[in-house]
């Protein structure tokens, strides 16, 4: 079996990736979230496949087909709620995974980091088009508002919006193409995830100390397969608690009402995992400026390798930047809260302050704190 594992053309790839892979002996539970994201993706693809068997992407029947899945399909309610809450678990793992990458300096592996940013953007796109499919009030108005942002692009904006809508408003053509995108994107994400792993295994994984771990490696199996299994069981436990006891806690009550183009909800807002970016978008009075800030809020992640001027790897021995990092995390939570609030005083002002702080921490404060710590080392 050992000879086959090491020599077989296909098994050899699996062996080098998940069995005999040399791994740093000191990586903590924060490194579990990569495997948890893989697990989330598998859950989403499987539950999504079963939902697609019963869903109809037509404006007249989409809402009814989701109700039919919940009422008439065997365990349809469970599949639907696993899929909806699975998306939330996916984004929780994603935010922690990115947060760990920032804290421990994983952005130094620039190819892996940049493919990760592409994966993040594709996951956000998939979640957005997926949210439109149940064709409730928030689905319809969320799609209308977010796609309409493209009209801020000079010259081609209006044409581009109508091209994406497939008409002069969000309608049947939009729903059909969004379903097609939502079906195909997870498979593209899976392919990119393999490329992400490929680049990671080229350089080897980072570790909490930020030091070179070539002299102290252990095989991935059985040490980290066991550790990953524990993480997967805990993830499934939280997901099942959400799906079985609090299935609608992360959803929007407006989505229980079928889409009505003649009735606008009081507060249009996306799913909770987009609220931080939505808050940044709303905090700028100018439409084009808001769209640029929205894009920048994600693409700013690509600046981390460029702005890093520290002589140390990761934040483990850098108390000044650690404080700034946790302020950044708290600021992100404030933005998420503000994104779900109405556009009125004092929420608008808090949103503007938090948006400026978000960008200032990454572009100004972190490089300054790095310089301070570099000078402390010289003392």
UniProtKB/Swiss-Prot annotation:
Entry cofactors: heme b
Specify whether Transmembrane is a keyword of the entry: yes
Query: Binding positions for heme b b562?
Result: 83, 182
- Tell me which residues bind a ubiquinone: 201
One example of the protein's molecular function in GO is: metal ion binding
The record's comment on cofactor binding reads: Binds 2 heme b groups non-covalently.
Per UniProt, the keywords (alphabetical) are: Electron transport, Heme, Iron, Membrane, Metal-binding, Mitochondrion, Mitochondrion inner membrane, Respiratory chain, Transmembrane, Transmembrane helix, Transport, Ubiquinone
Q: Has keyword Transmembrane helix? A: yes
SUPFAM superfamilies named in the record: a domain/subunit of cytochrome bc1 complex (Ubiquinol-cytochrome c reductase) (SSF81648), Transmembrane di-heme cytochromes (SSF81342)
* Transmembrane segments annotated in the record for this chain: 33-53, 77-98, 113-133, 178-198, 226-246, 288-308, 320-340, 347-367
| InterPro entries the record matches | Cyt_b/b6_C, Cyt_b/b6_C_sf, Cyt_b/b6_N, Cytb/b6-like_sf, Cytochrome_b, Cytochrome_b_C_euk/bac, Cytochrome_b_N_euk/bac, Di-haem_cyt_TM
The GO biological-process annotations, alphabetized, read as:
mitochondrial electron transport, ubiquinol to cytochrome c
Subcellular localization(s) per the UniProt record: Mitochondrion inner membrane
Q: Name one GO cellular component term.
A: mitochondrial inner membrane
Per its UniProt record, what PROSITE patterns does this chain match? Answer: CYTB_CTER (PS51003), CYTB_NTER (PS51002)
- What CDD domains does the record tag this protein with? cytochrome_b_C (cd00290), Cytochrome_b_N (cd00284)
Q: Which residues bind heme b b566?
A: 97, 196
Q: Which Pfam families match?
A: Cytochrom_B_C, Cytochrome_B
What is this protein's function per UniProt?
Component of the ubiquinol-cytochrome c reductase complex (complex III or cytochrome b-c1 complex) that is part of the mitochondrial respiratory chain. The b-c1 complex mediates electron transfer from ubiquinol to cytochrome c. Contributes to the generation of a proton gradient across the mitochondrial membrane that is then used for ATP synthesis.
Q: How does it assemble?
A: The cytochrome bc1 complex contains 11 subunits: 3 respiratory subunits (MT-CYB, CYC1 and UQCRFS1), 2 core proteins (UQCRC1 and UQCRC2) and 6 low-molecular weight proteins (UQCRH/QCR6, UQCRB/QCR7, UQCRQ/QCR8, UQCR10/QCR9, UQCR11/QCR10 and a cleavage product of UQCRFS1). This cytochrome bc1 complex then forms a dimer.
| Record's miscellaneous remark | Heme 1 (or BL or b562) is low-potential and absorbs at about 562 nm, and heme 2 (or BH or b566) is high-potential and absorbs at about 566 nm.
For this protein, the record's PANTHER family field holds: CYTOCHROME B
What is stated as this protein's family in its record?
Belongs to the cytochrome b family.
Q: What is this protein called?
A: Cytochrome b
Species name:
Akodon kofordi (Koford's grass mouse)
Q: Which gene encodes it?
A: MT-CYB
